[in-house]
Amino acid sequence: MKLAICTDVFADLSYTDMLDKVKSLGIDAVEMTAGGWGARKHCNTAELLADEGKRKEFMGELEKRGMRISALNTSCNPLWPSKTGEEYKRSMYDCATLAGLLGVKKIVAMAGLPAGNETDTTPNWITSTVSWPDFMAPAYEY
């Protein structure tokens, strides 16, 4: 079995320090947030899409350590019934484009949830109402 780690847990570390930390734990693969609502601390999607040299440098740091990207993460809700959903769709597209340029074969994503009716402005996600996300409690009460 091969293990990977989602690098968001090392958001306080620089990209190279994070890679060194992960390698010191005996892990050779990383999942990096490249879109959605994640911090994207270690994977600047816009920069990497725009600059082939940056992509080579980015991948070179992994290769120096004998590491690889197991997946790019773009968890979000592209079906969100507002401008937010459009932004998430773009984010997912950019993540998929970057994955192709980097040779990454897996993307972690969420399908998302649509509105509950034609005039909804929040996703219809009332199965999680206690603590997260905080905007769902009013929908549940409604």
Model-predicted regions and their roles:
Residues 1-4:
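Extreme N-terminal starter segment of soluble prokaryotic enzymes
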Residues 6-10, 33-37, 74-77, 112-114:
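Active-site beta-loop-alpha junctions enriched in small/polar residues
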Residues 13:
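Residues that form or flank phosphate/diphosphate-binding pockets in enzymes
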Residues 16-17, 21, 55-68, 78-142:
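Active-site acidic/histidine proton-transfer and metal-coordination neighborhood
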Residues 17, 21-25, 34-47:
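Conserved N-terminal beta1-alpha1 strand-loop-helix module at the mouth
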Residues 25-29, 103:
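Glycine-enriched alpha-helix->loop->beta-strand junction motifs that scaffold or abut catalytic
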Residues 31, 71-73, 108:
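Conserved beta-strand positions in the central sheet of alpha/beta enzyme cores
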Residues 33, 41-63:
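Glycine-rich, positively charged N-terminal anion/phosphate-binding segment
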